[in-house]
Amino acid sequence: MQYRDLGGSEIPASIVGLGTYLAGSGNNDGEYITAINKALDHGVTLIDTAPSYGWGHSEKVVGQAIKGRRDDVVIATKCGLWWHDERGSPIGEKDGKDVRLSLRPDTIRIEVEDSLRRLDIETIDLLQCHKPAVEPELTPIEETMACLAALKEEGKVRAIGISNVSIEQLDRYRVAGELASHQCRYSMLFRAPENDVLPYCAEHNVASICYMSLEQGLLTGKVGPDRIFNAGDWRANAEQWLPWFRRENRQKLLDMFAGWQDLLEHHDCTIAQLVIAWTAAQPGATHILCGLRTADQGIEAAGAAAILLSESDVQRISSDLTALGNPVTEQLGG
């Protein structure tokens, strides 16, 4: 297992972390708790959750999973998505709840106390603003950061992070306080952060915690062109907004993976592990989140962090990705 500090916080965390969105479903809590513990047994320390994942249920599951192992884990949760009253800016409805964005100090403090209770811990290692504030209730970044800094002083939070912000907002957050991390989508198939966010974070010692690095299973090698998703699976219509899910593009991915067979054998790894290792080797991409449902997936995620790719391995994979092209811009190779 490899570990890297969360920016300037001096909090070491495994380069592979567990994304626990699915733990919010309420299905098979016991299996999920076992999966988390298997990953911890294999060296994973970073666990990412949020109050909005199952409206608190994910945090409860994580809290149960880490009982007796608090010193083994780095708990990252979030604030900002608010559904308890009319404070904040409306952003939509989900599961019958009116969801709002609120980064005002009073709602942040309520969220922190609720998260501490659900997780059954005394301190949140990394508290992240889930999304940037929006109109009409546009809480100034400086006001939000002052609240988060106060929570650090009170010992309720160890480090401050943000997620899903623009490069301009990222700079304002960093200038306004001690910023440890930024969470963003980044993968082999979504490399826009390489143009701004990742270089900025690398320059200013801010950790980049990357999610969707396996692109909802597309980068595991297990989603072929003939795969049909169940009606209840959102991926059934994913190609409308994620062109890589088109049948012809899934085949292009499988063809690329087939060319990596010698790498898989040399590193004794799966396609998913190789993909994660390449992602973690990119400049600025310090930590990679992996979703999981089963114990085997937890073990597989942990194993990815043990893979050390050579510079030639990284360059070879990068060249293959360049040749693959980008269906978003309709620039596809071969």
Tell where the protein language model's regions lie, with residue ranges.
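Beta/alpha (TIM)-barrel catalytic core signal, keyed to glycine-rich beta->alpha loops juxtaposed to Asp/Glu
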Residues: 132-324, 331
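Active-site groove signature of glycoside hydrolases
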Residues: 116-135
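Structural motif corresponding to the early beta-alpha repeats
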Residues: 72-102
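Active-site mouth loops of central-metabolism enzymes
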Residues: 19-30, 93-109, 135-137
